[in-house]
Amino acid sequence: MVERLTRQLLAFQLAAVLAVAASVRFGLHYGWHTALGIAFLVLVAVRMGISINNFVLAWQYRSDTPREYRLNAWLFLRMFCMEFLASMWTTSWAMPFKRFANAPVNKSERLPVLLIHGYGCNSGYWHRMRRPFDDAGIVYRAIDLEPVFADIEAYGPLVAQAVEALCRESGQDRVIIVAHSMGGLAARAYLRQCGNQQIARVITLGSPHHGTGIANFGAGMNCRQMHWRGNAKTGAPSIWLRKLDESEDQATRELFVSIYSHQDNIVAPQISSQLAGARNIAFRGIGHVALALHPVIHACVLDEIRAAWALPLPEKASHAEQPITEN
């Protein structure tokens, strides 16, 4: 579905560029090259305005940034440009044309990796991470979370099916999950429903473990489940997130590594990505979409995967529970 929608969005943008170019060409009597250039700049300005709006909204819900993670004006501008380019690349190329969900995998002597994307994305989001994984000899699989606006609990069975398939095809009895944004919550929903017997590690990138104020402006049941109401100090997560938090024991939390940025422009408060009992790793100067595209994050994820490969088998596993409702 996301693949189709992003292709339709590209077609609409192309039509808009041609319409603006024609208006400039015949209304202002510029040449076609100039008219097309102006039309393209208009498109870039609109897309950049969307990115600016995300940062403005995130600022309203921001958490305090530790001194060592603060940015000067130049570093912030560089981060904004990187996030804008990451968003353009992801929505205009990776998600429309590079989807690779459920691709078959080979047998592996080491634990394989399951990639879970976030809200409004598909498996194409992970395209830039494929080369580092291939170079490291990692066997991996990605899934698409659909329906796009569904209850996050409904993604649990999709994750379960992918885990079973990945174990069967790789010949391993456990997997490592790497999840971006809402994908981390889908992984937590899966663990609550199915237990952690088949999971060696969960590495989340910019996941709103306690919600995000930006979700208040989004559509779908999954957005409502990711709500954060109020400011960073006095606000509160959704009922669903609170119940999810209460359902997890220490053994489950110890499986998690939460990687996040203090300048995340979608997850705000940014410290919402911190998960008690987990290993929390903070970065600065990286936006939300850029997390899975940045070489520094690639290196960190690879380090955590290699660390999970060296872990001994768990002594105790948690058991499955019933899905959480908002009642």
Range-by-range predicted roles:
Residues 1-113, 321-327:
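Flexible, membrane-associating and regulatory peripheral segments of lipid-active enzymes
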Residues 28, 192-327:
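Helical cap/lid subdomain of alpha/beta-hydrolase-fold lipid enzymes
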Residues 78, 112, 176, 257-259, ...:
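Residue-level marker of motif borders
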Residues 114-124, 132-246, 250:
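Serine-dependent carboxylesterase/thioesterase catalytic core
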